[in-house]
């Protein structure tokens, strides 16, 4: 497997030049555009890695999967989906167009920014400090990495430039989708997106979902399996933004991307996969990372369809 992974990475490196680093979060322009790596964690305990698998990046929108599960655990699916929909939009991840023109005025799904902000606003806690601590503790539990932390420079960069997210949040507050203090909820959202990870960390999140919420180390079921299935279904239909349909056809596994260049993928009952490639395509997905997953899926026949 090791040789095959190295070969797949090398065959996709040429795509890096055709992508770009995101510019709307200034700190993300400091990323190494040429980085490309993969980490695979399997339910039988075996692990495979290649390339820049230890490269550190911020989790960004991949965090939306975890906060969705937390909100579902806190409130149950019926209430959460009164506040956010389940359908793909076909629009860019940061688009606010349908939020205003479609009734009822709620975000289409939890994987776009508006939906994720609404979901994060539902995470329970008596104070902002308790809420971010709950998020960090759950991330550490699922990844098995007690050293996870927020990248402060990315967090401050996102907070200072997040005007579009701020506009969406205040609109959702106005129509009753978001409860509580808008700036407090946005601050929580910016922090969750700025958690620094490696391919191994997001592969472990994928592994957790592949077992429907069982921790590999303990064999303990720590979430409702139904909530894991909901997350994977939404990853399949909405996780790669407005390229989700194409990804489902070409790769065929649940996945969630982030503008930090990461992609977290799940092969149900088998493995979790973490890929990093900061150079993004026009949809906001890792341009080489998508190619790597497509080749890997074909080689190992991973498609769930």
UniProtKB/Swiss-Prot annotation:
EC class: hydrolase
Q: Name one Pfam family in it.
A: Glutaminase
Q: Which domain of life is it from?
A: Bacteria
Keyword annotations? Hydrolase
> Which EC number(s) does the record attach to this protein?
3.5.1.2
For this chain's UniProt record, which GO biological process terms are given? Answer: glutamate biosynthetic process; glutamine catabolic process
Q: Does the keyword DNA damage apply?
A: no
| Binding-site residues for substrate, renumbered to this chain | 61, 113, 158, 165, 189, 241, 259
- Keyword Nucleus present in the record's keywords: the answer is no
Known catalysed reaction(s)?
A: L-glutamine + H2O = L-glutamate + NH4(+)
Q: Name one GO molecular function term.
A: glutaminase activity
Description of how the protein assembles with itself and partners: Homotetramer.
| Family per similarity comment | Belongs to the glutaminase family.
Q: PANTHER family this protein is in?
A: GLUTAMINASE
Task: Specify the protein name.
Answer: Glutaminase
Q: What is the lineage of its organism?
A: Bacteria, Bacillati, Bacillota, Clostridia, Peptostreptococcales
The protein's gene is named glsA
């Amino acid at each position: 497997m090791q040789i095959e992974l190295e070969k797949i990475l090398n065959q996709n490196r040429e795509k890096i030049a055709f992508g770009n680093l995101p510019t709307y979060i200034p700190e993300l322009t400091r990323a190494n555009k040429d980085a490309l790596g993969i980490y695979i964690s399997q339910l039988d305990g075996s692990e495979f890695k290649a390339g820049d698998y230890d490269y550190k990046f911020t989790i960004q929108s991949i965090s939306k999967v975890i906060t969705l599960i937390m909100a579902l655990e806190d409130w149950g699916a019926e209430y959460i989906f009164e506040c956010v929909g389940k359908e793909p939009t076909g629009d860019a991840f940061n688009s606010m167009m349908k939020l205003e023109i479609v009734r009822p005025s709620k975000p289409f799904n939890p994987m776009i920014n508006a939906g994720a902000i609404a979901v994060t606003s539902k995470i329970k806690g008596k104070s902002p400090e308790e809420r971010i601590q709950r998020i960090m503790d759950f991330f550490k539990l699922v990844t098995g990495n007690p050293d996870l932390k927020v990248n402060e420079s990315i967090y401050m960069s996102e907070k200072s430039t997040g005007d579009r997210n701020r506009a969406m949040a205040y609109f959702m507050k106005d129509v009753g989708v978001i409860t509580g203090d808008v700036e407090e909820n946005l601050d929580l959202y910016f922090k969750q997106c700025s958690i620094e990870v490696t391919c191994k960390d997001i592969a472990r999140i994928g592994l957790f979902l592949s077992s429907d919420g069982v921790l590999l180390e303990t064999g303990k079921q720590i979430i409702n399996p139904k909530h894991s299935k909901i997350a994977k279904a939404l990853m399949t239909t909405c996780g790669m933004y407005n390229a989700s349909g194409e990804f489902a056809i070409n790769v065929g596994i649940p996945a969630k991307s982030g503008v930090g260049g990461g992609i977290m993928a799940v092969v149900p009952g088998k493995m979790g996969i973490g890929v990093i490639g900061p150079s993004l395509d026009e949809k906001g997905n890792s341009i080489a990372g998508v190619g790597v997953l497509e080749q890997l899926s074909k080689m190992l026949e991973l498609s769930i369809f």
